[in-house]
């Protein structure tokens, strides 16, 4: 691959002594399949590649040198004097290959011959500007005007010998538009001018027609009937303010108060309530308020239980006694007398004696009265055998006390405040006790109950007197 590149580089550089080709560097017939032969060929290829690279580098340097020389010549020609400019025409014509007087100019031939000699003498210093100036100065050393003078004979022979010169062809082409293009452009410009003139005339005619028309006022635009901008801004501001207040109130309503604020509000409410109660207490006189009846009053006494048991036994024996009494025969007078005589020795004394009654005895009806059907129908003992009444006297007293308590409660309801009190429960308790007499007995009169009744009576009398006085005053 390196040999191919080297050969390509050598072919691209004209005028060289030797050319490295692919056939000279690589001969496949000489290659053996041994390692030593392979490495030897590899070294040869590397050496050939290095030699080709050196040649390419030298060619590149020569090319750069020629470019520097041409640039220096162009710079010195532009800075030369006016006399040199007048004499530069024959020199330039001598350097050009197309001029016929190339053989006559000896000075120019010397300059062209000196260039390669100078390149051979100083190949490393050509790139500098000082060398270029020295070279230009040496070109004008052997210059003479006589070399450029021509005689008439020479001119005639030159005219005969010379062929017809060719026309001068400039190297820079100046573009000139075609006549057709120019004509098309003029026609286009003329059409655009005519169009503009036509539009101006139309616009002028329209303006004249508008001016000639009779004036007619247009209706009032609708935008004038709309409210002013200041009014709209004011309305929006009011609406925004109301919305802000509404949202603020909603936020305050949804906001939970702090604990100490709620506690202070509760304390303030309690203080106000106490002040109101104090004012009411000062205005109204203090009313009597009795304590509730103790519960032990409704409890049955200790001697009620044996009485209940005795009465329960009597209630069981009374039906049997009634049946025996109805079925037993009437006793005789002798037996009756013996039964009635307490001193009779025949009858034993004690609790086993039985009383014998005659049909004519007035006490028979009295004896049968407790066992009548009316008494058994009204007596709740037979209906509820577990609950028994006590004596009639005790029940009357109890009913009287309960009636007094009810009357006192009704009187107190009229003069009492609307809020409920513990005394309201006493009528229900008394009614329950009256409905269940077997479990509760009516309360016994005490000193406190008697004092309460007297106070109720006194207050009732005072109220009646006050009502009578007010009615008389009216």
Curated annotation (Swiss-Prot):
**Quaternary structure and interacting proteins, as annotated:** Interacts (via central region) with CFAP418 (via N-terminus); the interaction is direct. Interacts (via C-terminus) with microtubules. Interacts with LCA5. Interacts with CEP290. Interacts with SDCCAG8. Interacts with FAM161B. Interacts with POC1B. Interacts with CEP78. Forms a microtubule-associated complex with POC5, CETN2 and POC1B. Interacts with CCDC15.
State the name under which the record lists this protein.
Protein FAM161A
Q: Where is the composition biased (Basic and acidic residues)?
A: 450-468
The UniProt family comment states: Belongs to the FAM161 family.
Positions of the UniProt region annotated as Disordered: 78-126, 185-210, 308-364, 412-474
Question: What coarse category fits the chief subcellular location reported for this protein?
Answer: cytoplasm
Q: What does this protein do?
A: Involved in ciliogenesis.
The record, for InterPro entries, names: FAM161, FAM161A/B
Q: Does the UniProt entry include the keyword Acyltransferase?
A: no
| Entry keyword set | Cell projection, Cilium, Cilium biogenesis/degradation, Coiled coil, Cytoplasm, Cytoskeleton, Isopeptide bond, Ubl conjugation
């Amino acid at each position: 691959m390196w040999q191919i590149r080297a050969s390509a580089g050598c072919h691209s550089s004209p005028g060289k002594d030797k050319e490295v080709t692919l056939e000279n560097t690589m001969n496949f017939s000489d290659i053996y399949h041994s390692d030593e032969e392979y490495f030897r060929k590899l070294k040869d290829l590397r050496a050939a590649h290095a030699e080709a690279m050196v040649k390419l580098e030298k060619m590149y340097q020569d090319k750069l040198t020629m470019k520097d020389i041409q640039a220096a010549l162009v710079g010195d020609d532009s800075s030369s004097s006016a006399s040199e400019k007048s004499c530069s025409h024959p020199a330039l014509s001598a350097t050009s290959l197309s001029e016929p007087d190339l053989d006559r100019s000896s000075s120019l031939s010397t300059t062209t011959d000196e260039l390669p000699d100078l390149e051979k003498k100083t190949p490393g210093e050509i790139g500098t500007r000082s060398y270029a100036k020295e070279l230009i100065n040496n070109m004008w050393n052997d210059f003479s005007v006589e070399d450029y003078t021509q005689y008439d004979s020479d001119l005639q022979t030159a005219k005969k010998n010379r062929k017809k010169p060719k026309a001068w062809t400039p190297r820079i082409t100046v573009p000139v538009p075609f006549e057709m293009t120019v004509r098309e452009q003029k026609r286009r410009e003329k059409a655009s001018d005519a169009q503009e003139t036509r539009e101006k005339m139309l616009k002028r005619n329209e303006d004249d027609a508008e001016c000639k028309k009779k004036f007619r006022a247009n209706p009032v635009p609708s935008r004038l009937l709309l409210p002013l901008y200041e009014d709209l801004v004011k309305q929006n501001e009011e609406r925004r303010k109301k919305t802000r207040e509404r949202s603020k109130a909603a936020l305050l309503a949804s906001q939970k108060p702090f604990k100490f604020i709620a506690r202070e509000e509760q304390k303030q409410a309690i203080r106000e309530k106490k002040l109101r109660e104090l004012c009411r207490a000062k205005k109204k006189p203090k009313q009597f308020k009795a304590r509730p009846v103790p519960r032990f009053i409704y409890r049955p006494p200790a001697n009620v239980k044996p009485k209940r048991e005795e009465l329960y036994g009597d209630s069981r024996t009374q039906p049997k006694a009634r049946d025996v009494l109805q079925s037993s025969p009437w006793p005789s007078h002798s037996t009756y007398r013996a039964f009635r005589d307490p001193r009779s020795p025949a009858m034993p004394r004690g609790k086993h004696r039985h009383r014998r009654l005659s049909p004519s005895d007035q006490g028979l009806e009295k004896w049968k009265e407790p066992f009548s059907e009316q008494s058994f129908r009204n007596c709740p003992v037979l209906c509820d055998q577990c609950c028994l009444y006590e004596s009639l006297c005790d029940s009357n007293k109890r009913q009287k006390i309960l009636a007094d308590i009810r009357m006192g409660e009704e009187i107190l309801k009229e003069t009492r405040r609307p809020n409920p009190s513990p005394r309201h429960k006493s009528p229900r308790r008394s009614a329950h006790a009256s409905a269940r007499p077997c479990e509760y007995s009516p309360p016994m009169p005490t000193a406190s109950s008697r004092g309460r009744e007297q106070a109720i009576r006194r207050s009732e009398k005072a109220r009646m007197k006050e009502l009578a006085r007010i009615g008389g005053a009216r």
